[in-house]
Amino acid sequence: MRAFLGTVAFQGRVVIGEGEKDNAPMLFNGEEVGTGTGPECDIAVDPIDGTSLTAAGRQNALSVIAVSDRGSMLDASSVFYMDKLVTGPAGVGVVDIRLPIGENIRKLAGALGKPVDEIVVSVLNRPRHEQLIQEIRDAGAGTRLMSDGDVAGGINAARHAARTDMCVGVGGSPEGIVTACAIKALGGHIQGRLWPRDDDERQRGIDAGLDMDKVYEADDL
């Protein structure tokens, strides 16, 4: 990926990379890529979203790059994780990450014109999501638990032909930015809230100018 980006005629700057979080040697935050000519761009990269999936030869691992005009992409690199809510176009103006998950499921079911028990929600299978998964099931919806790959999970939730209707929960901030780009292209709904792991990370985000309490919409991301 790094070698390819070096051939592109643009002045690219990595806004969100994987370097610090995953101890990667390149494509780090702030790195300049491209030929140095052409438009100035922001870049978010996720060389492999779903490393374990790739190692096991399973589906839903992706290699992704998101590119936007310089200054338009949220630099959330100081906070590694983000809580996200993603749906297809039916969820636009209907669901809201600030609402209880059960209410969002019922609202989306109404917008889609199908019963709640036919709604399927994808969630990363992590201990931090145990209560969220139980609340989804208590609401009457089905769950699709992902071992990895929440970019694919978000994209599938926004695709008309996919078998999931919503993707929720805490995943990586880089994945959130990349997912937002895809969801905008698909006309779907995405909201995100930064999820600092401790007080030090929270303060690091505040020092970087991020709002820890803000709900970031697609255009913000």
Annotated model-derived regions:
Residues 21-23, 128, 147-154:
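Short acidic loop-to-helix transition motifs that present clustered carboxylates
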Residues 26-28, 56-58, 77-79, 131-137, ...:
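Short acidic, glycine/serine/threonine-rich loops at helix termini
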Residues 64-145, 208-213, 220:
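Acidic beta-strand-loop-alpha-helix segment within the catalytic core
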Residues 156-221:
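Oxyanion/phosphate-interacting regions
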Residues 47-56, 61-63, 130-131, 151-155, ...:
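Short glycine/serine/threonine-rich phosphate/pyrophosphate-binding segments
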Residues 5, 148, 168:
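Residue-level signal for inorganic ion chemistry
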Residues 1-70:
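Flexible, acidic active-site loops/lids enriched in D/E/S/T/G that coordinate Mg2+ and/or position polar
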Residues 6-7, 32-38, 46, 54-58, ...:
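Solvent-exposed alpha-helices and their adjacent loops that cap or buttress functional pockets
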